[in-house]
Curated annotation (Swiss-Prot):
Disulfide cysteine pairs (residue numbers): none
Record remark: domains: The IMP cyclohydrolase activity resides in the N-terminal region.
Tree of life domain: Bacteria
Protein encoded by which gene: purH
Organism taxonomic ancestry: Bacteria, Pseudomonadati, Pseudomonadota, Gammaproteobacteria, Enterobacterales
The protein's name in its UniProt record: Bifunctional purine biosynthesis protein PurH
Length: 529
């Protein structure tokens, strides 16, 4: 049963005025009476639209610098009144039914994001009347349509045209869901902000409490339902943040291939975030959330060829990420050489997509070009709780490194050390990465002891016939014993980059000196669990 409700009267009060004039014109052209407030009313009047100010309708002026505009029984009675049940009392108090409410809220998020925003500024951008109208209309969705997103304007007009000026219950219910999501997200932002301001508010500190309020409210929007999760007996969906500011797997568009799986998305994220570390043309190949080959080159084809050489066996069925447009030559090389689950790049040429289309199962994603990395939060779910931390955006340059051994690294060793240090950040701990000439030649990931990660990296290099002598090695955390250095030296490593900080640093440095290895301390750790 459609349960259509005609739209005869609409109340419009928006902070974000994108598209509101055109929407109001369309409503007016269909005989809808327009009520409005403040700046929205002035804008519509300036455009020649017949509009009644809410203060004229209620007979009560706006007051307290606009804090009180719509908090009136004639407004909320018109929204909440149940058609066919409350008609008599509405008529007794001269309350006209309001069939549609078009509201978006004061820009609280934009206000508090501004540098130097005071608590007073934030408070004045907490909307009261707006959320009240939104919730009233959503509660009475059986009779009233609530519109909080400008992206819905065109579809609403089309449905009205298809239904003789009416909207169906299904549409009103869908709009009500969006409305409650909108107010929930809005209240969450305010609660998070106030929660982080508690010490400053009570005079305990001049600074806010930081990024972590005492109650953490999160809002994510479902982007995809998945066939299943990490395993086939687990149900799953993919949720994303609204207004993501950095190109990511969350913002990516799938331009080709079958549906993404849970594991595809997780691995694609790992590959893309790693390739973002490099300014030069780069390729990252990931398998089970770990890089199995990384390289930079003169072109992305060169980078791919070199990354693939690290571990062709593991590259089978992997995820490939680039930091440049996917071109036809590179696409052909991939398709001719290996089975690949996902290719992600900032963009893809038409010629490249024609080539990858020959393999229907290959998923191709484009995410747009990225700029600077955006600070944010990382989450890890534990049973009954949530671990929250800042994203690991830590970086070191050559000028920040400390040479702690007798021998200084050569220029090439230094370049390779910085290269494999970037890669190690994205390898599961304990992480060891061997690199030579700006390509990985062996990766040891996820071992419970660091020395075994070092041994595995050497074994991988030997298995592929890659020359380790003269290579650099990165370790995501300090060496607790000298055995990792001994293993690296036995494989042929001549330079080591690591955080330092072990109580046995002296022994580790002495081991490096014994082997003639140059050692660099970053004073920064990159655990990844």
């Amino acid at each position: 049963m459609q349960q259509r409700r005609p739209v005869r009267r609409a109340l419009l009060s928006v902070s974000d005025k994108a598209g509101i004039v055109e929407f109001a014109q369309a409503l007016s052209a269909r005989g809808v009476e327009l009520l409005s407030t403040g700046g929205t009313a002035r804008l519509l009047a300036e455009k020649g639209l017949p509009v009644t100010e809410v203060s004229d309708y209620t007979g009560f002026p706006e007051m307290m610098d606009g804090r009180v505009k719509t908090l009136h029984p004639k407004v909320h009675g018109g929204i909440l009144g149940r058609r066919g049940q409350d008609d008599a009392i509405m008529e007794e108090h001269q309350i006209q039914p309001i069939d549609m409410v078009v509201v978006n809220l004061y820009p609280f998020a934009q206000t508090v994001a501004r540098e130097g925003c005071s608590l007073e500024d934030a408070v004045e951008n907490i909307d009261i009347g707006g959320p009240t109208m939104v919730r009233s209309a959503a509660k009475n969705h059986k009779d009233v349509a609530i519109v909080v997103k400008s992206s819905d304007y065109d579809a609403i007009i089309k449905e009205m045209d298809d239904n003789e000026g009416s909207l169906t219950l299904a549409t009103r219910f869908d709009l009500a869901i969006k409305a409650f999501e909108h107010t929930a997200a809005y209240d969450s932002m305010i609660a998070n902000y106030f929660g982080s301001m508690v010490p400053a508010y009570h005079g305990e500190s001049k600074e806010a409490a930081g990024r972590f309020p005492r109650t953490l409210n999160l809002n994510f929007i479902k982007k995809l339902d998945m066939r299943y999760g990490e395993n086939s007996h687990q149900q799953a969906a993919f949720y994303i943040e609204e207004n993501v500011k950095e190109a990511s797997v969350a913002t990516a568009t799938q331009v080709q291939g079958k549906a993404l799986s849970y594991n595809n998305i997780a691995d694609t994220d790992a590959a893309l975030e790693c390739v973002k570390e490099f300014a030069e043309p780069a390729c990252v190949i990931v398998k089970h959330a770990n890089p199995c080959g990384v390289a930079i080159g003169n072109s992305i084809l060169d980078a791919y060829d070199r990354a693939y050489k690290t571990d062709p066996t593991s590259a089978f069925g992997g995820i490939i990420a680039f930091n440049r447009e996917l071109d036809a030559e590179t696409a052909q090389a991939i398709i001719s050489r290996q089975f690949v689950e996902v290719i992600i790049a900032p963009s893809a040429s038409e010629e490249a997509l024609k080539i990858t289309a020959a393999k229907q199962n290959v998923r191709v994603l484009t995410c747009g070009q990225w700029g600077e990395r955006v600070p944010g939060l990382d989450f890890k779910r534990v049973n009954g709780g949530l671990l929250v931390q800042d994203r690991d955006l830590g970086m070191v340059g050559a000028e920040e490194l400390r040479v702690v051994t007798k021998r200084q690294p050569s220029e090439q060793e230094l370049r390779d050390a910085l290269f494999c240090w970037k890669v190690a950040k994205f390898v599961k701990s304990n992480a060891i990465v061997y690199a030579k000439n700006n390509m990985t030649i062996g990766i040891g990931a996820g071992q419970m002891s660091r020395v075994y990660s070092a041994k595995i990296a050497g074994i991988k290099a030997a298995d592929e016939g890659l020359e380790v002598k003269g290579s650099s090695m990165a370790s995501d955390a300090f060496f607790p014993f000298r055995d990792g250095i001994d293993a690296a030296a036995a494989a042929g490593v001549t330079c080591v980059i690591q955080p330092g900080g072990s109580i046995r640093d002296d022994e580790v440095i002495a081991a490096a000196d014994e082997h003639g290895i140059a050692m660099l301390f970053t004073d920064m750790r990159h655990f990844r669990h």
